[in-house]
Amino acid sequence: MPHGDLPLPPSYRPHEVKKAVEEFWRRNRIFEKWKSWRGGPKFTFLEGPPTTNGMPHVGHIRGRTYKDVVIRFYRLLGYDVWVQGGWDMQGMPVEWEVEKKLKLRSKKDIEQFGLEKFALECNSLVEEYLAYWREWGTKRLGLWLDLENAYETRQPHYLQYAWRIVKRAHELGLLTEDYRVLWFCPRCETSLSDHEVALGYDEREDPSIYVKFRVEGGVDEYLVIWTTTPWTIVDNEAVAVHPDYVYAKVEVEVGGRREYWWLAEALVPSLMAKFGIKTWRVVETKKGVELAGVRYIHPLAEEVPERASRPHQVVTAEFVTLEQGTGLVHIAPGHGPEDFELAKKYGLPVTNSVEINGIYNELGGRYKGKHVYDVDKEVTRDLRSKGLLVFEEKIRHEYPHCWRCGSKLILRADRQWFIAISRIRDKMYAELQKVNVVPTKLRDRFDIFVQNARDWNISRSRVWGTPLPVWRCKKDGRILVIGSLEELKKLAKELPPVDDFKLVHRPWIDQVKISAHDCDEWVREPYVMDVWLDSGIAWIAAVDGENNRDLWEKLFPYDFVTEGIDQTRGWFYSLLATSVLYTGRAPYKNVLIQGLILDKHGQKMSKSKGNVIWAKDLFEKYGADPVRLYILSKVAPWEDLSFDPDEVKYVIGDLNILWNVVKFADTYMSLDGFDAEKYPLSQWLEKGLEEDKWILSELNIMISEFTNFVKNFEFHKAAALWREFVVETLSHRYIRLLRRRVWSEEPSPDKYAAYAVLHDVLKKVLILGSILVPFITEYLWQAYVRKYEKNAPESVHLAQYPAAGSYDKELIYAYRELFAVFSALAEARNKAGIKLRWPIREAYVNGAKYAERYTELLKYLGNVKEVKVGRRPDYLCVKEGELEVCVPDKIEPELYYEALARELIRRIQVMRKETGLEISDEIHVVVETNSDDIKKAVEQYRDYIARETRAVKLIIDAVSQGKEWDISGEKVKIEIRKAQA
């Protein structure tokens, strides 16, 4: 692109800017030049791979904007950046979308559809959405990631590292198969890990029932328990009490009958009130330990006869509390981790009458073939009919749901595969303490989760995922753990006729026949692995670290990762766990935790609510830069962001101001033949005015603060600071001061000094802004910077980060005071009804420290003939803090004609712009009016009007084709024509 070849239209047009810039980047291979290593220090970024199972939305765009800001920042600082992209392309999220697409409702439906076809459908789906993510989640955002070399979790060379991790765990004795109580999704028919469960908590309404268990041998004597899962009573095996709590035998009257209920003594009054029982008394008390051994009759003995065949009794447990319920806890060892451990302690049977799909098996007696959630209601109904239901209500509480399909989870005992995280969590915690987690207020959440980490259930009863690399000898039950595809091929006596991609996926891997280690038939455990293990190995698998050791050692540990707050229990956690297991080290140095993104009403976004904002819609309407700057400016990255699309227009307004400032510079520099290399700042600054030194001081402070904000991930402060500098400091202040100098046709040294200063300021503003808004800054760099500085870097993104120079504090204070005084003066004029364009005789300034220093500037800014220090009580006065400004409450008659002349000038300038005249074009002006005042203003200020509007001819006459205006209640018609050369 020739220097300065891009045009500068009258206003900022995001879509046209994006199109031109993308073409420039493509044609000149700017990204390739940008990402190439030049021997500098390294800054390595690890991409948290988005799952390509749907369209990117504004939540994704928020996080990816933060990533881009940090990467671009360090590249400008001179670092060699590592920006490999990544895609998460397996697991339950993908399967769930395919099931919806194919209208499959269960695992049985998948099997009938065919595992091969289903796996291929999953692969096709992620391919389809990958195209959207490359375009709308990356390119249109301006996010510079290396997508040509992006890692994909589905690829053989990548997922083999999950096998390596499992094999290493096996070698360290950390891989175990165990029978435990776990959370299951009955819809997806698979177990879930603790961190997956933590991702899906949501508030819901559930039954809350109080039930009587009849004491064996007692006369109308009962143990009263409480539960929110009535279906688990089917598998009840005991009732637990705290050994040290006092329990009361309470005599109550129910339906005309006298009964005796055992409850925690401390809870009796509140429970009686809840149950609506007015007549009651405590007849006996015992400590929990004394109740141990008391036998009771299973409340569903008739419905589930198998339970009636063995005794049930009271046991003691330290985990019993008085916070909820009755102080007596119903124990179902197959449906609760604490219940399960208690069963092991007392030798209780672990009954599990519920299958993985939530359906009762033959152990469920009369409930066989029914779903737990249907049985919930049925059990309550049966207990009521038997007179065992004491009280029922609904309760709202946080309960785990499937993090992908949203189904309510169930606890059930099953045999699964685990990595014993409990044995390395102390090391994980120690390594985490070496990591800079931002913000500090959220690192506690991460710390606590790691400190309490439980063994990682890695097996999933699904199809599209990384196969669990564990084979079992059919003859003797020994296990074989395979750590690579090469090892698998070496041990295989028969392989299916497929490529490597299919070979490492179900169902093809299950067709591999292995004969080794004195076993003729090894059968693979029928699981895929937790999808969080897939993304959790990115720290090494992304670059095939074992086969590219030199590269990996330059990258690891990665300098920066960032994702949402839920990833403290998701990706951040799985990265830490796998890395510590494999290397003994944390895989990252800096973790930025992002807040949630909400709709404008503060509600969570969801498809069901219809309030999701899609990236495609946003970018098509507003363009990327306005969306980026809005996201960056609104709140701190770690705070929840309520996204209001209507607010993006304010950002567009600020970017348009930047555009206008650059256009202002281009207009006058072009007229005067400015060349930044001919008029270098170092040589011309001393020829300038004090205001030039002031703006450079403000710039240097801004650069220093901006840099620190970005380094500390305070993007909201950096973006706000940059916007304020552009809009207020540069446009509203410096440019306002500059206009009187550049409008002059005399080629004075201070004018070229002003150009040199303005060019330096704009250049540095664009470089800083390039990390925030990469498209508009590139466009202005090409259209303006390279036009006036031929040897400027080819792209703003290839420029060098500006150093923060020295600054004059006193000068800054003086000018900030000047503009505070000007603000007060403008407010006083407004209250007096005197426009800023209208001159006033004098203004009084009181309480200003530097008033004498900037008197001339205040006269120019405030359109005041004379500025005096002091106060004038008979004038209209406005106070701002310690400052006070007083002005006349009406315009003096002798200044009225000058005011009218200024009004005429404004109208003529508007008409020049409307007719598309260049700033250098000279014009003829005809004014038609019946107003003697207007005529007098033209005659008296003819030279002034002509000079300000570049009019070579100004007459009062009839107008044939003009525009009618109202000036102070007088009708005026004005016609302008370009003067012929």
Curated annotation (Swiss-Prot):
Known EC number: 6.1.1.5
Subcellular location: Cytoplasm
Pfam hit, one: Anticodon_1
Cofactor: Zn(2+)
Binding positions for ATP per the UniProt entry: K607
Keyword line: Aminoacyl-tRNA synthetase, ATP-binding, Cytoplasm, Ligase, Metal-binding, Nucleotide-binding, Protein biosynthesis, Zinc
Record Gene3D superfamilies: HUPs, Isoleucyl-tRNA Synthetase, Domain 1
InterPro entries according to UniProt: aa-tRNA-synth_I_CS, aa-tRNA-synth_Ia, Anticodon_Ile_ABEc, Ile-tRNA-ligase, Ile-tRNA-ligase_type2, M/V/L/I-tRNA-synth_anticd-bd, Rossmann-like_a/b/a_fold, tRNAsynth_Ia_anticodon-bd
Reaction catalysed by this enzyme: tRNA(Ile) + L-isoleucine + ATP = L-isoleucyl-tRNA(Ile) + AMP + diphosphate
Residues spanned by motif 'KMSKS' region: 604-608
GO cellular component terms, A-Z: cytosol
Annotated motif 'HIGH' region, positions: 50-60
A single MF term (Gene Ontology): isoleucine-tRNA ligase activity
Protein's GO biological process: isoleucyl-tRNA aminoacylation
Enzyme class: ligase
UniProt function note: Catalyzes the attachment of isoleucine to tRNA(Ile). As IleRS can inadvertently accommodate and process structurally similar amino acids such as valine, to avoid such errors it has two additional distinct tRNA(Ile)-dependent editing activities. One activity is designated as 'pretransfer' editing and involves the hydrolysis of activated Val-AMP. The other activity is designated 'posttransfer' editing and involves deacylation of mischarged Val-tRNA(Ile).
NCBIfam families: ileS
Notes concerning its domains: IleRS has two distinct active sites: one for aminoacylation and one for editing. The misactivated valine is translocated from the active site to the editing site, which sterically excludes the correctly activated isoleucine. The single editing site contains two valyl binding pockets, one specific for each substrate (Val-AMP or Val-tRNA(Ile)).
Family, per entry: Belongs to the class-I aminoacyl-tRNA synthetase family. IleS type 2 subfamily.
Subunit (UniProt): Monomer.
HAMAP family: Ile_tRNA_synth_type2
Protein name (Swiss-Prot/TrEMBL): Isoleucine--tRNA ligase
Provenance organism: Pyrobaculum aerophilum (strain ATCC 51768 / DSM 7523 / JCM 9630 / CIP 104966 / NBRC 100827 / IM2)
